[in-house]
Amino acid sequence: MASSHFGPASPASSTPPPSSAYARLIAPTITRNSSSSSSRSTTTCSSTSSVQAVPMRPPPIETSTAATSRSQLPSNRHSENEAEHDTSYTSPGLSVGGRGGLARNGPRSNRLGTSPQARHVPPSIVALSPSPSPILNMASKRQSNTETVSGTSPSTPLGKSFLAQQDLSPNSSTIPLRVTISVDPNDRLSHDRESHSAERPRSSGNSPVRGRHGHLSTPSSPTNSYRALGGKPRTLSVDAGQNWGGSHRSRARDGDDRERRQSQVSSASSGALKKHSLDDWVLGEELGVGSYSTVYCVTPSANTHSPTSPQPARKYALKVINQAHLIQEKKVKYAMVERDALIRLSDPRPSKGHKRGVSSSSSSGYAQTGSAGKRRSTASIGGQSSMASVSGGTVSNSKKDTRDRLSIVTTSSAASSPVLTASSGSTQLSPTAVSGGGGNIKGRRPSRSAEPPTPVQEQTEMLIRGGEDGKDGQDGQETPSREWDRDRDWDNMTRSRPPSPVREESAEGGEKEKDEEERSGAEPVELGAAIHLTLPPPQIPSTPEPRGSPLLSTDGHRTSRETPRDRPHLTPKRRRQSLAPSERSVKSASTTGKMSAAAHPGVVRLYSTFNDSSSLYFVLSLASNGELASIIRKHGSLDITSARYYAAQLIDTLEFVHSRGVIHRDLKPENILLDEDMRIKITDFGSAKIIAKDEPIVDDSSRSRSFVGSADFVSPEVLRNEVATTASDIWAFGCVLYQFICGKPPFRGATDYLTFQKILKREVEFPKGIDEDAKSLIDTILDLEPNLRPSITFIKTHPFFQSIDFSTLWTIPAPPISSGLREPSKSTTLAQLEASDIWGVFEGSDVGEEDEDGFEYDADTVSPRPEGGAVGEGMMEPLFDRRAAASAVHNVDHPKFSRLRNQYINLGEDLDPPRPAYAGAGTGGRGKREKEVEKKKGEKARGLSHGSESSGGNRSALAGWLEAIKFGGAGGGGMSGSATSVAASDTVRTPGTGTGTGPGSRPGSRAGIPSFGLGPGSGSRSNRGSGASMRSDEARDLSMSLGGLRMNMSKASEFDKWTPLLLANESIIFTSPITLRTSSPALQLHLPAFLLPAPKKRQLVLTDFPRLLMIKDDNEADGDPAGSDSGAGLSSSSHVESGGGGVGGGGRGGGHGSLRIKGEAVFVPRPSTATGSSTTKGGGYSAVPNAVMDVQEKGSKGFTVQTPGMVYYCHVDSVELRAKWMAAIHRVGL
């Protein structure tokens, strides 16, 4: 091959006499021709027989890039004949910062430097070969402007170029640099051995150096100029050849580097979606806040949404999960379980999901060389025999398919919508569009850059079973050889991946592919508004390949023609892939009328997951109408038509979820969302259990199981620590259906503990007017035995769903929602309901307050953490804890067992409330009334109620605890004694002179709190023994009887008005009317006063329990309930309602139905040194939701009472009354 050499020229040849016709151009006068694309200009003269060149100035080193060859760099060696010929030039001086008058990327400076610079001699180009050098022939090639020297930059600015100041090595001399320019890109450029050789070997066909043969190759990266030519340069690129500067590189390493570069753009060139990040989404409004996550409405950013799309950007829900909170609260598994469950519900096949972004050879952007074969795109239509041809709007193949196959019918949404086209063999589908009548297909071509592919509009896909011999693949006929399996075929066919426009051939070239085409063929596919695509089932190799061109197989496995053994040097490393399906893999079934096995409209869909250093992100489908629970609260309850519609959608979704091996285990209205069409979507699979479809459920009672779910909807087998099955979701479905119709859960109690007892006893009551079919279905579902609960098939065929057509359930419009059996509160607005009850449980505007069957404690109770912040086993389980369930099960199974140990109860261990010291002390006989009640009922009483129905249907958490744990149920302990007269006092009532001295007598005081009698004429009053057991209705009769005795006193006091609301043996210490406001502790420091709820008139009562009661009197809501601001309430003219003490009294509560307990705060007793008891782990204030934590003065006439769940702002009428209250509270315990 011809080559040219730089070298020292002889005086005769290097200094020819100047010609008058062609003036000699020296280096400082060389300028660029604006019409040339080259940065060098040369002029030749032939005064002798040899071809010689005028000295040429190389480009300055500051403008060298990674594409600049070493041969083009200047040298610091000077010519010996520099003094003879004045051909030297200088470069501008260095400016501040080392930029020698020539910016890094800016235009060149035309000014000469002022400082003296070293003089350099440009090398001479001498052609020693008969074949001219490409550089010498550039002048003739500029006319056509069709070829340019590789490495030149069209953006290089015009003007003079200068050399910058260079580092001078000690070994530098004035001898010009000897440079060899080779035409062969495979030349080794060895200056020591081959510089004087005029012959060069021919370049091989598989030269790794890019560039066309016969032209200069792409220049390499610059090397250090001060190094000797024989030294080892620092080459930053692999494109300089196999051996550069003595550094030998192997062909295998060269191929690895090339493969590494190809894998960087493989994802973009194959159409695979890149990994999402937060920058890909535009955050909108906040949809909701959970315990460890926040949900936002997001839309794709501009770079991921096609601006030419006729539809607006689709909205999604982005769930942001705090990783630090997950780790701290030990809830990492909930996020992982939710992700895995949603993936299974979207793509439930046992095989691996689609591998996004895999760096396979089928998606590489560069052509393979050598044995890898050539790549051909499925979008190409040029004369390849193996490619499908396009003619007259038909894509056809020369071979016929004689096998069973599946067809895809794709209907475009518009005339300009892209459609799918098919290629021969088993290649991937490539989205293209048909334009014009010439058959030219325009669409996405194989990309060679890292730019994201053009988005393709969603298509509506419908799968049809083709004929056996390949005819009429779209008619939907079944073949006689294979029975149509809906789940299997839909499951297999909807598996998809982003289409790859590049197809890979085998290592043997195109022969293997040709054999594949001969073995399988494809029917013609017509292009139009609706096209039919034919995919023959590919051959499944014995060893599935994790890399290469995945194929769509009929059994859900991906196949490939090659194995890693065929291409060992091209197989990249495995990468972590997302199992979430692509958007085009699952289509909406609402337009086709058929349900896809890969998705269900009743389940929220997971689109992608990603994370950063602080959070996890789940991209979910958007449910714009919020939770179904808020709709129930808004309307009070659902009408029977809406309840039937949403219950049918719920049970249909449960059938799908269970068929995919997922048990939700936390089904409730809060986890049921409504989309824009008012159809349900089940969400929050963090508590789900994932099992195989055919996996038998093994009951391993010795295994420690986690309690998950919500207290109102948990099944009895879960409470008993048994294995959770699909029957647990059926139980929850029955509870949800009950709440749809009745407006509240069937087993809700004041605490989780009471709720568990109701569930275990199956204490459910149906309101009047409930639909009989609904009542029958709920009663059948709520069976304590899981095996006796009905199946989903039975539920669907129940008469309650007789009017429901499940085949069109998800396509018919949703019925309008109206109120059912329970009307919404008149004073409650939607804005207040959507605030998540931030104003508290006891507000006058609570849901159901005006209703007769209203339940005050509608807020879920969260189990508190123990003192000290310690996290024990089971403490981080959601909404209810292990100990409450175990205690409830134990008390139901052993009703006669008493857990009372002493006067102080360990709240964290035994879940018992605080109680006075006298409650468990002493034994004695019971009163006459109690004995008559026992004799009438024939059994012992089991509990004590404070009269929830007699007090207006209200319950408190404390009274519920007392009823459940058999308060006073250990050891007899009656109390008798004659009370003395009541002396008037400003602040605290003085104790009377007690005459009862029996073993059951009540002590005179406890912890400094005096005891009081009931007034003159009260006679003796006995207390039920601690070992006694009495039912709630008997306790209410006793309470009303005692209330009647109080009302018949000769001198009634104001205290007697509130005694029906008190517990047995509980006395009032201090009371007065107040104006009450409530707020959440989390909001008290952030909300201004005008945003707080309106103040309410209440009666504040302090008892010797000790506790504070906020009582509402409906009859005196507009007036002064107490009529006195003295605080003691000892007015002789006290208001007494007709009917007396409640025996035979009219209205709710036996004449006291107007009184309601709206709030309660308990002073937790501390352990005393006299008894030697101590508070163990889990006790203290944090273990009681309504325990008084602090009491502070606020303003001149107010004070605040703070509990873990509520802050009470109490305002009295005078400063003196506030002082009395503070003194009474401090005497009690603070």
UniProtKB/Swiss-Prot annotation:
Keywords: ATP-binding, Kinase, Nucleotide-binding, Serine/threonine-protein kinase, Transferase. PROSITE patterns: PROTEIN_KINASE_ATP (PS00107), PROTEIN_KINASE_DOM (PS50011), PROTEIN_KINASE_ST (PS00108). CDD domains: STKc_PDK1 (cd05581). ATP binds at S291, Y292, S293, K319, S621, L622, A623, E627, E670, D684. InterPro entries: Kinase-like_dom_sf, PDPK1, Prot_kinase_dom, Ser/Thr_kinase_AS, Ser_Thr_kinase_AGC. Residues 850-859 have a biased composition (Acidic residues). The protein kinase domain contains a 228 residue insertion between the ATP binding site and the active site. This is Serine/threonine-protein kinase PDK1. The lineage of its organism: Eukaryota, Fungi, Dikarya, Basidiomycota, Agaricomycotina. The gene is PDK1.
